[in-house]
Amino acid sequence: MADIAQKIRNTREDFEERIVEIRRTTKVTKGGKNLSFRVLAVVGNRNGKVGVGVGKAREVPDAIRKALSAARRNVFEVPIYNGTIPHEIVGRQDAAKVLLKPAAPGTGIISNGTVRAVVELAGIHNILTKTSGSTNPVVLAQATVNGLKNLLSLEKIAQLRDITPQEVIYGVKKEG
């Protein structure tokens, strides 16, 4: 029980919220058409924590509340080095692929709107992205999240290669 309370307190941090998409959906039944709304929301602290959530309801405010609540529940940490990601990675979800590449300082965020919302709120300032396949914002956001979740920190990369983090950044000097 204490773990749940701690998780709720953690979600009360100063997260910035962004609504990426509000889509009206219609279900046709024997009695007519039932309207509802689907909302895609992103929350992040611009310091390495970000979450994405989807909410569905008959009214827009209820859908927004559900989406923001789902996004706060799905917050995770992103390794960031010098305002960018440590290495190139591809995130996949269903028919969507998102290529995330580190960029030099001053490059900015080169991306489409959905991916931009996720990486901006994660706190990444310089990144190159390329999307292919599905252009559905929900699927693109989930593909971006999958890519960011699979990033390795500099320390983890150094440990796997059996070198120091400085050698990962600046390269290993060749002898001879």
Curated annotation (Swiss-Prot):
Q: How does it assemble?
A: Part of the 30S ribosomal subunit. Contacts proteins S4 and S8.
Q: Where is the S5 DRBM domain?
A: 15-78
Keyword Magnesium part of the UniProt annotation: no
Q: What is the name listed in the Swiss-Prot or TrEMBL entry for this protein?
A: Small ribosomal subunit protein uS5
| Alphabetical list of SUPFAM superfamilies matching this protein | dsRNA-binding domain-like, Ribosomal protein S5 domain 2-like
* Cellular component terms (Gene Ontology): small ribosomal subunit
Q: Which GO terms describe its molecular function?
A: rRNA binding; structural constituent of ribosome
Q: Please give the organism.
A: Thermosipho africanus (strain TCF52B)
Tell me the name of the encoding gene. Answer: rpsE
